[in-house]
């Protein structure tokens, strides 16, 4: 860790860049990284400063000093090129949970999208994005479906929960919001599923928890980079919740949602391969999903989805005739 900048009296911003000494399978990394974060947090307490962690990432391909390949300057994530992309999502998420549990105020992953820098800049190839920027592939990387859940539910102005576990290979963290809703993420580093009973102390549990799953052996990918839907509703039995966490996976449990069916999209019209529709007027609307079927009564599914967009039109590259449906997706993922 090294200091990059200081903003105001209350903050200290640092980055961790690469953790080149740790592979994705390293089971001690969580403990070591949490200790480093705790050291900085405690160092700043006497000065009444908060710690913001910026630009954190995993091991760099070619390592430092070996990133000039055939005259091309490269800065790329090792896991994206060594077959460990899906599994390494566990490590990047436990890195974030370690920071939360150590008292880090906020953090920023390196990076949201690949940077294909112009030739005159220092790096001509920068591949760290949750989204690819490539001539043949602009899709999401597997990390999006893991780290993206933390971004959605470990949100601004939430407060970290105190979480204890006797299992060294279960790494967890959570937050509670001002309205009493809460979210808990659990990373299972075991090679087998684990049954867990979670005791909820001083938390409201008057509605079922939505369970979101990132399984590194079966990544819930979307052609359109949509975050996965929740796969289970888990009722609270008193102050306890029972959950199964599959091997090498991440489970996120949350009550931070409103159970709501977005209003139907109207005015759908298809002409010469372009579909248009009336804009949603709901305050919590976020984007649209477009579907195409063979009959007017087809059922929208992940398999027949043809687009995700914030626009109110879509031009279908497939000239084949068909029927279209459009759904609104809201802030809680309802559609």
Q: What is the meaning of each model-derived region?
A:
Residues 280-302:
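Solvent-exposed loop/turn segments flanking beta-strands in beta-repeat/beta-sandwich domains
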Residues 316-334:
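Beta-strand-rich modules
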Residues 228-260, 324:
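C-terminal beta-strand-rich structural cap/linker in extracellular carbohydrate-active enzymes
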